[in-house]
């Protein structure tokens, strides 16, 4: 249901419209953005209480939300680009909110500059597309696309570069971990549910063009997504800062979404709908449980005044609501039934196995790594050895209702979202897609996830961690390299 009006006429044949496009994926994104933004606004009343610049914080938060809403309802690629850049500016302001901290200033500049390089590719792609397609619409005339030849795949490839920057795909991921210098509620909104999935939304919005005129580009996105997911999961396994664990987890999960879209190239159109639907389904479920994880991390940081797991341990008895809701989110992202991540992740794995058994097993292995590092994080925070020296200075306590209500709400959504008949709501061709759970894939993935959780329990649940310490010492070079993100910042 688009509504358009002419904004900028260039030639008799080429002009830019502004308007509102409401279709299944834009409506889904509106629900995600509005829901998470509302929870973050409520949560921030408690988290940001007493902070200098309280009004400025809410102004920036509202600007970001408006920009993201404008991006997802854009009726053409140029209008999307306008709001795309507004998202970049508002995220720069939010990441650098603590402008008296050198680290926050450096992080905001880094995010802005890295994404600007990617956005240059996006802009060039838009201009090439507009010139050869003779429109900026998402649905150009087929005759113009055929006549353009190889220029359309080039344009779409450059657009994907822009999406890779926003969605922190390797090697343009380097801005996201440092962006954790912003307030934690900002991380829940920007770096879990909205801005970082803008690249996924871009590919999904342009999906008919990718699969019809640039399948080779879509094919490569799958490999980029898979490598990104593996790289980020490897780094997440050894981080000690809880927000950075979640940051690399986000990068890895976005890789899953990109892979799901990319594997739609070599299978029949009906099966292609599986990857598309699975990607959008995982975008929705991930937004909820990752926002829950970040907000839970905010409560923990608020209680112990530190991001480091060494300052935590044994917090379950002090923070029961945060503990239970964080556990629900960890089970969801690990793909444990009946939480939402089980359903969306398994649809992605099914699509990957139908594309290639090798790709299926690679992504299953990365899913196992996800379960391991998330429960390493969970045990490090809520079990393990309590830091009594630090806790004596300020006894940990449960967060106020303004902060725990969003946790409870998002936990409830995480518990039930997997049962939404997503295939009836969103598909690549507008036709309903019936979800059939592949029992072989589901059984295999859940057994592997449980084994990974068991390994994390054995290594990290006790008061001492001799196995983890011994492994870190034995593979010290690999451990150090992973801890330093394989020196990508230095490169």
Feature-to-residue mapping (PLM):
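Short phosphate-coordinating micro-motif centered on Lys-Gly-acidic
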Residues: 85
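Hydrophobic transmembrane alpha-helices and their helix-loop junctions in integral membrane proteins
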Residues: 39-80, 89-395, 413, 419
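Hydrophobic alpha-helical transmembrane segments
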Residues: 15-33, 151-163, 362-367, 437-455
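Extracytosolic (periplasmic/ER-lumenal) interhelical loops and adjacent juxtamembrane/interface segments
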Residues: 1-22
């Amino acid at each position: 249901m688009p509504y358009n009006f002419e904004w900028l006429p260039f030639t008799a044949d080429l002009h830019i419209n502004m308007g509102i496009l409401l279709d299944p994926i834009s409506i889904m994104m509106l629900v995600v953005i509005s829901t998470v933004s509302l929870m973050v606004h409520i949560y921030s009343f408690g988290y940001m209480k007493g902070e200098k610049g309280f009004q400025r914080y809410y102004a920036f938060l509202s600007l970001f939300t408006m920009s993201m809403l404008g991006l997802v309802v854009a009726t053409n690629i140029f209008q999307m680009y306008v709001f795309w850049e507004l998202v970049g500016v508002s995220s720069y302001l939010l990441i650098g909110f603590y402008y008296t901290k050198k680290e926050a200033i450096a992080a905001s500049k880094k995010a802005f500059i890295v994404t600007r390089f990617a956005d240059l590719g996006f802009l060039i792609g838009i201009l090439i597309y507009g010139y050869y397609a003779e429109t900026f619409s998402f649905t150009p005339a087929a005759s113009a696309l055929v006549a353009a030849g190889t220029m359309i795949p080039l344009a779409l490839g450059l657009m994907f570069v822009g999406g890779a920057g926003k969605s922190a795909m390797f090697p343009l991921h380097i801005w996201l971990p440092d962006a954790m210098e912003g307030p934690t509620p900002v991380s829940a909104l920007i770096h879990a549910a909205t801005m970082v999935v803008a690249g996924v939304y871009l590919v999904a919005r342009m999906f008919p063009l990718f699969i019809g005129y640039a399948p080779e580009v879509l094919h490569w996105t799958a490999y980029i997504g898979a490598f990104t997911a593996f790289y980020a999961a490897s780094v997440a396994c050894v981080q000690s800062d809880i927000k950075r664990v979640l940051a690399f987890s986000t990068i890895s999960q976005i890789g899953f979404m990109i892979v799901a879209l990319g594997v739609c190239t070599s299978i029949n159109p009906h099966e292609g709908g599986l990857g598309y639907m699975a990607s959008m389904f995982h975008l929705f479920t991930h937004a909820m449980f990752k926002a829950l994880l970040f907000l839970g991390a905010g409560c923990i940081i608020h209680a112990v005044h530190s991001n480091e797991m060494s300052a935590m341990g044994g917090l379950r008895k002090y923070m029961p609501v945060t503990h239970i809701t964080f556990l629900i989110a960890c089970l969801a992202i690990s793909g444990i039934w009946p939480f939402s991540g089980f359903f969306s992740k398994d649809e992605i794995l099914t699509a990957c196995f139908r594309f290639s058994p090798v790709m299926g097993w690679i992504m299953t292995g990365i899913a196992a790594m996800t379960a391991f590092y998330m429960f390493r994080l969970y045990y490090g925070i809520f079990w393990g050895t309590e830091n009594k020296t630090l806790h004596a200075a300020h006894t940990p306590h449960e967060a106020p209702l303004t902060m725990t209500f969003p946790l409870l709400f998002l936990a409830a959504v995480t518990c039930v979202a997997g049962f939404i008949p997503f295939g009836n709501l969103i598909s690549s061709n507008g036709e309903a897609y019936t979800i059939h759970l592949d029992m072989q894939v589901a059984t295999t993935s859940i057994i592997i996830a449980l084994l990974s959780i068991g390994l994390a329990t054995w290594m990290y649940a006790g008061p001492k961690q001799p196995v983890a310490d011994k492994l870190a010492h034995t593979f010290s070079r690999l451990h150090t390299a992973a801890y330093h993100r394989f020196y990508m910042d230095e490169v």
